[in-house]
Design a protein with these regions (language model features):
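A short, conserved alpha-helix in the catalytic core of glycosyltransferases
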Residues: 161-170, 174-180, 184-212
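Non-catalytic, C-terminal membrane-associated alpha-helical segments of glycosyltransferases
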Residues: 228-236, 246-297
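Glycine-rich, basic loop-to-helix element that forms the pyrophosphate-binding segment
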Residues: 62-82
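Short, flexible, basic/aromatic active-site loop/helix in glycosyltransferases
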Residues: 135-161
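Conserved donor NDP-sugar-binding/catalytic core segment of glycosyltransferases
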Residues: 94-128, 133-135
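Short, acidic, metal-binding catalytic loop of nucleotide-sugar glycosyltransferases
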Residues: 23-32
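Short beta-strand-to-loop acidic/aromatic patch adjacent to the donor-nucleotide binding site
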Residues: 84-95
């Protein structure tokens, strides 16, 4: 019998993405999966719509916005109780190729964590994620695109140091060793943190070129520069640097200074609106104010 995959979806007002997503799930060649739908107090009717439409899924509706990290952990705990073999963390603003789950499971043997090729356009012209690596100098990650793939002539499956939280398949035994997502991030940089923890535990991470999906980049704020992303990117990057200072090559104090110089002191006319939120991110990091921000975004 094929191994069981529990797909964890964290939803916040994702109504406009559900039909496309659900249609692609129905077409999967791999059928031994269960969806765990965790809703963070949506107000657009998406939780009720999903629950009534996909009755075989497990729907968990929270009364507050618990964030991506906490939402994933709720789904992960459910999967563990059900003795899942794998957990697939997946963004709801995606459309999957028919063989996505099948290919990921195939290449995850040996307790690997794997991520697929991710397109940013429906016509599959632009690759948004073609594998990635963490930069231990800056605390940021690089996602490889078409030009890197062609130049390096990558195989179907190659090792990476950053797996994308948009879609990552994790063997349940790895989760038991490494743990779930760090909820102090709330959103953003939680996948960077997981990637570093995988590395510290000796878990191999791989990019699977033969497995792909379309990510409607921006559906979960990804790809959008706004006051919300500027705050969380600033605060969480510094937290990541401090938490993993044992393997980082730059002091988080130095990174904080560089962020201030680049985004506050040298901010252009179009970026001055972000200055209060960058400063708030720096301040909240230093006073240890993590989790969901009290900022009114």
């Amino acid at each position: 019998m094929s191994k069981s995959v529990y797909i964890v979806l964290v939803n916040y007002n994702g109504m406009k993405y559900l039909d496309d997503f659900m249609d692609s799930m129905h077409k999967q060649t791999y059928t031994n999966y269960k969806i765990v739908f965790v809703d963070s107090a949506s107000t657009d009717g998406s939780a009720e719509y999903f629950k009534n439409t996909w009755t075989e899924a497990k729907t968990i509706i929270k009364k507050e916005n618990v964030g991506f990290a906490r939402g994933c952990n709720i789904g992960i705990e459910y999967a563990k109780r059900k003795k899942a073999d794998y957990v697939l963390l997946l963004n709801i603003d995606t459309v999957l190729d028919n063989n996505l789950i099948e290919e990921l499971v195939k290449y995850s043997e040996g307790e690997r964590v794997v991520s697929p090729k991710i397109y940013s356009t429906r016509d599959k012209v632009d690759i948004w994620y073609g594998g990635g690596d963490l930069n231990y100098e800056t605390g940021c990650h690089a996602q490889y695109h078409d030009e890197r793939l062609e130049k390096e002539n990558f195989d179907l499956c190659h090792e990476i140091t950053f797996v994308s939280g948009c879609c990552m398949l994790i063997p349940i035994e790895v989760i038991k060793r490494v743990g779930g997502l760090d909820e102090k991030y709330f959103m953003y940089y939680d996948d960077d943190d997981m990637s570093l923890r995988f590395r510290k535990e000796g878990v191999e991470m791989r990019y699977i070129y033969s497995s792909s999906l379309w990510h409607k980049v921006g559906g979960s704020y990804a790809g959008k520069k706004n006051i919300l992303t500027e705050y969380y990117f600033t605060r969480n990057r510094l937290y990541l640097m401090k938490k993993h200072k044992d393997i980082m090559r730059t002091s988080y104090h130095k990174i904080a200074k560089e962020i201030f110089e680049q985004k506050v002191y040298k901010a252009g006319a179009n970026d001055k609106q972000y200055i209060p939120y960058v400063l708030r991110g720096i301040c909240d990091f230093y006073i240890g104010k993590m989790g969901k921000s009290s900022c009114k975004f």
